[in-house]
Amino acid sequence: RQEVAHRVFTSTEFSPDGWIPPHHEMSYSHNWPSYIHFYCQTPPATQGRTPLADERRVSARIPEAIRQRFLRHGVCYVRNYGPEIDLTWQEGFQTDSRAEVEAYCRQTGTQWTWLDDQRLNARQVRQAMVRHPLSGETLWFNHAHMFHVSNMPPALARALLDEVGEQGLPRNAYYGDGSPIEAEVLDTIRA
């Protein structure tokens, strides 16, 4: 993303042929927007739709046992920033200052480890569900299905796992207690 004005960012930069599954804007963050706005300056030649979903219906479709486990534990997001894979830490944190990255991590409860001068591992446990500020309903609100390795095309996931192992993946998600999220749970969430 690029910042085009103070707190105004472009959408995720992604291939025009690609598909980004439905998700909650910045739910992996400690501070997410109350509102999002959409604008298209240059429409794509084909497709280009932005689907929206009623989160009450989405939450209701997820079985109670799954909701309760995520509600109890939250989601642990693991990111590995580096020049050879995904984003660099400078791109991800939009700064060249390691001190600023560390201050941000301390402020947001994110654990971090500098693996070397160019690579950073960050782990954060966040909520899996939130209480809606107006209705009071507890709703599904996370990126577990997006960050998890199973969201990658299978051939890419296998290649990355062979190359860097599970702990070196650019991103992955676990239950907040660090245990793996089962494939069938993710299949249910994505259904």
Describe the function of each predicted region.
Residues 2-24:
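A gly/proline- and charged-residue-enriched helix-loop-helix capping module
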Residues 16-22, 31-191:
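Active-site environment of non-heme Fe oxygenases that use a 2-His-1-carboxylate facial triad
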Residues 3-5, 27-28, 43-46:
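A short acidic, glycine/proline-enriched capping/turn motif at secondary-structure boundaries
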